């Protein structure tokens, strides 16, 4: 007789096993039409999942944003169904949900074009109008393999083989009428819920990202809960085209990515200046909050990754290498290396907290289909820190982390920040007393900082609760960047300890802290937020000195020397072009200030100034300009002079 507890605290007892759907029919029959899936003890389950034991049950409805992923997964299956109907000999490859949509790889014997895309979308809409129900059934891996083998779905067989590494038992398949696919997530109950979708583009990709493999057609699409959300997204896509960091980066000559090295960034001079300026800013804050900056190896012995738990939980995303009969893991994150530094000497409770930071070069084997400019790459730099502290220090350390994050985000002009506190999941280490204190410390730190936040119940990591801070950009997009994470597990796994006041060994708490997250990704966010118009302190070139003719070249060379001595990033444009041509070109390059020097300026020891926003200032005293410019740079101002 399972006792079912609901989110509002009420309970009901049932005589035997019962499905989540039947529970809802009992407690709120009028809500069944909008019911998407359930959560049982914090785990998402299908509507028809059976509950046999005492459980906490939550109902998730179609208006809930958490349904987006399952709508998109179901859209992928719908896309596969339409592909097989239009081109029966085609084969379905990898697919996944992206931040604002989904993709699916297919093998066909022709190259896709716009007509193919329109035909496919029309077919999908016909299927949606049938309003068919989606069913899920569990099979042994052997039986599932037979099903896909009989259908000549060679890529699905490969994906099933990969599942063997994780379960060795059974696999769930979803049935869209005659079409069958691997169930990656819960499906929507009815395909009509996928009606707010649009196929957007296509491209060619190598299977598994390897050039020696077949070229597949990758189809990208987007889907949303409501029509209004879809239309808003499509409108934003148009706006984003002018903000696309990949296009702007070409104009500004920031970086490039090569086809033979996907997900790896080649920083050019201009881009590397932006990168280094961000590091300089973070270093100012690291000094203020008393961090020690370190550097740990890019690869470490496999045993460290095994002991830390990363090999068991993160192996699919790690690059491994062998040398001299040793196996090494290239680091996907910095934390195990920081624990090695903490463990290098015996620590006293008086030494804590110890704050270790690093601009660590990390590598993650991201799927080729998920790679996107600077936003999703395989080699990135984390502005990562780990604070080793006592339990009584958690609250103050977390408060300092929050303060640091807000100070930095304010510099960039981000005003709206979404803060979430993720609490204990069902599967976790540590007792409830530790979790109670940890969650309370995080909540107290947020409240004392006068920060509004929302709970994400059951969404913490198995080793500790966390705070997530997400930025809203000018288009309303949410970027999850900063995290503050408590960790009870890693110090135990890697045998970290300090000597307490009773001269006994005690395990420290680790606070994981990142502000920008991936620096590369943060640069991508800034490019799109500023549309390439970096604040002067961050701009690769802050001032261009342009002469009207050769008579004024000596004067601008003297100005250049003065700027160089002050650390102002400037360059000379002495080309034999008209001054109007030079101005247009440098405005297109988004240079904050263009200095123009002609006869009058040379004679009076002044400058004429043109800002990239189009404002002109005549006969400005050179020292006055330098003073204003240095003040603007040193204060991290987001505005140009007189804006």
From Swiss-Prot:
Its cofactor is Zn(2+). It comes from the Bacteria. Keywords: Aminoacyl-tRNA synthetase, ATP-binding, Cytoplasm, Ligase, Metal-binding, Nucleotide-binding, Protein biosynthesis, RNA-binding, tRNA-binding, Zinc. GO terms for biological process: threonyl-tRNA aminoacylation. The keyword Nucleotide-binding applies. Residues 244-535 are annotated as: Catalytic. It is an enzyme of class 6 (ligase). GO terms for cellular component: cytosol. One of its GO terms (molecular function) is ATP binding. It is found in: Cytoplasm. Homodimer. This is Threonine--tRNA ligase. The gene is thrS.
């Amino acid at each position: 007789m399972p006792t079912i507890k609901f989110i509002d605290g009420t309970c009901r007892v049932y005589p035997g096993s019962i499905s989540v759907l039947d529970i809802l029919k009992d407690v709120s029959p009028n809500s069944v039409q909008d019911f998407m899936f359930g959560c049982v003890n914090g785990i998402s389950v299908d509507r028809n999942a059976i509950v046999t034991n005492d459980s906490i049950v939550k109902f998730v409805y179609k208006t809930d944003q958490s349904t987006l992923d399952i709508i998109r997964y179901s859209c992928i299956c719908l896309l596969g169904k339409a592909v097989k109907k239009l081109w029966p000999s085609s084969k379905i490859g990898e697919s996944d949900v992206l931040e604002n949509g989904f993709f699916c790889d297919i093998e066909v014997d022709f190259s896709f074009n716009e007509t193919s895309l329109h035909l496919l979308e029309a077919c999908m809409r016909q299927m949606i109008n049938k309003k068919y129900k989606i069913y899920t059934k569990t099979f042994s891996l052997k039986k599932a393999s037979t099903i896909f083998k009989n259908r000549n779905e060679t890529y699905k067989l490969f994906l099933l083989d990969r599942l063997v590494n994780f379960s060795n038992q059974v696999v769930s398949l979803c049935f869209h009428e005659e079409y069958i696919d691997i169930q990656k997530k819960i499906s929507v109950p009815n395909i009509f819920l996928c009606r707010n979708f649009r196929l957007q583009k296509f491209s060619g990709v190598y299977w598994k990202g390897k050039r020696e493999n077949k070229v597949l057609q990758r189809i990208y699409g987007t889907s949303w809960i409501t029509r209004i959300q879809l239309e808003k997204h499509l409108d934003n896509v148009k706006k984003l085209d002018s903000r696309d960091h990949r296009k702007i980066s070409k104009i500004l000559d920031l970086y490039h990515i090569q086809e033979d090295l996907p997900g790896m960034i080649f920083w050019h001079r201009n881009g590397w200046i932006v990168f280094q300026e961000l590091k300089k800013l973070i270093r100012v804050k690291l000094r203020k909050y008393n961090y020690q900056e370190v550097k740990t190896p890019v690869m470490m012995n496999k045993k460290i990754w095994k002991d830390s738990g990363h090999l068991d939980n993160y192996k699919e995303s790690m690059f491994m290498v062998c040398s001299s009969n040793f196996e090494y893991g290239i680091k996907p994150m910095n934390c195990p290396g920081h624990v090695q530094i903490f463990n290098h000497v015996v620590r006293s409770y008086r030494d804590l907290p110890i704050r270790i930071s690093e601009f660590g070069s990390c590598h993650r084997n991201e799927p080729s289909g998920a790679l996107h400019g600077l936003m999703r790459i395989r080699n990135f730099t984390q502005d990562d820190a780990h604070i080793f502290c006592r339990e009584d220090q958690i609250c103050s350390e977390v408060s300092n982390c929050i303060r640091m994050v807000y100070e930095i985000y304010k510099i960039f002009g981000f005003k709206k920040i979404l803060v979430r506190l993720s609490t204990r999941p069902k599967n976790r280490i540590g007792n409830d007393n530790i979790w109670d204190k940890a969650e309370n410390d995080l909540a107290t730190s947020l409240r004392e900082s006068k920060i509004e936040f929302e709970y994400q119940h059951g969404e913490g990591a198995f080793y500790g609760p966390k705070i997530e801070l997400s930025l809203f950009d000018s288009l309303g997009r949410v970027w999850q960047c900063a995290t503050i994470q408590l960790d009870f597990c890693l110090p135990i796994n890697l045998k970290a300890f300090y000597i307490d006041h009773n001269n006994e060994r005690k395990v420290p708490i680790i606070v994981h802290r990142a502000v920008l997250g991936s620096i590369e990704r943060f640069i991508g966010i800034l490019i799109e937020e500023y549309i390439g118009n970096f604040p002067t302190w961050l701009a690769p070139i802050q001032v261009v000195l342009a002469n009207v003719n050769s008579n004024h070249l000596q004067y601008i060379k003297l100005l250049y020397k003065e700027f160089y001595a002050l650390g102002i990033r400037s360059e000379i444009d002495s080309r034999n072009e008209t001054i109007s041509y030079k101005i247009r070109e440098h405005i297109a390059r988004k240079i904050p200030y263009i200095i123009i020097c002609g006869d009058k300026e040379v004679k009076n020891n002044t400058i004429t100034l043109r800002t990239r926003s189009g404002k002109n200032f005549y006969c400005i005293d050179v020292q006055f300009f330098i003073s204003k410019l240095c003040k603007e740079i040193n204060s991290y101002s987001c505005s140009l002079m007189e804006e």
